[in-house]
Swiss-Prot record:
Essential for the assembly of the photosystem I (PSI) complex. May act as a chaperone-like factor to guide the assembly of the PSI subunits. It comes from Prochlorococcus marinus (strain MIT 9303). GO terms for biological process: photosynthesis. This is Photosystem I assembly protein Ycf3. Belongs to the Ycf3 family. InterPro entries: PSI_Ycf3_assembly (IPR022818), TPR-like_helical_dom_sf (IPR011990), TPR_rpt (IPR019734). The keyword ATP-binding does not apply. It is found in: Cellular thylakoid membrane. Keywords: Membrane, Photosynthesis, Repeat, Thylakoid, TPR repeat. Its main location: membrane.
Length: 173
């Protein structure tokens, strides 16, 4: 049964009916409407923890969606799933694909930095300080971009940049 028909509570059912009506009335072509329905079903599945179904819906949405902005949102959600599943390489690649579609995605940069920083800590714990420093520098690079796009939005990252000595003074202006 399609995700849009598998609603258990009144609020979800009501929202789905309203969203379906809005989509039908939108002055966009049928292909874009179908892409949106797949995207919405992907979000619903992702929120329910059904990552396999979410990815299937996102893939279908990407086949239909032409808007770079909407494609970037879909790719970002896919990357979040890959990251949650521990597939960090695929997550990094997918975050980059999202940024290629829309470079104004600070959350993609933030999450990429989280992966690099985690890998840096792992390398450091293994005694691989040169590798750790390179990974920390990569984290700093993407986090600096994220902070520039969303000043004041990532205070923990700004603090990390300052305390590790990887902060550029112009990041905060």
């Amino acid at each position: 049964m399609p995700r849009t028909q598998n609603k258990d509570n009144f609020i979800d059912k009501t929202f789905t009916v309203m969203a379906d009506l809005i989509v039908k009335m939108m002055p966009i072509n049928d292909k874009a409407k179908r892409a949106y329905v797949y995207y919405r079903d992907g979000l619903s599945a992702q929120n329910a923890g059904d990552y396999a179904e979410a990815l299937e819906n996102y893939e279908e949405s990407l086949k239909l969606e032409e808007s770079p902005f909407d494609r970037s949102e879909t790719l970002k959600n896919m990357a979040i799933i890959y990251m949650s599943n521990g597939d960090e390489d695929l997550a990094l690649d997918t975050y980059q694909r999202a940024l290629d579609q829309n470079s104004n995605q600070p959350s993609c940069l933030k999450n990429m930095g989280l992966i690099y920083e985690k890998r840096g800590r792992t390398a450091q714990e293994a005694g691989l300080q040169d590798e750790a420093d390179q990974l920390f520098d990569r984290a700093a690079d993407v986090w600096t971009q994220a902070v520039r796009l969303y000043p004041g939005g990532y205070l923990d990252i700004e603090n990390w940049l300052k305390t590790t000595g990887r902060s550029n003074i112009d990041v905060y202006f």
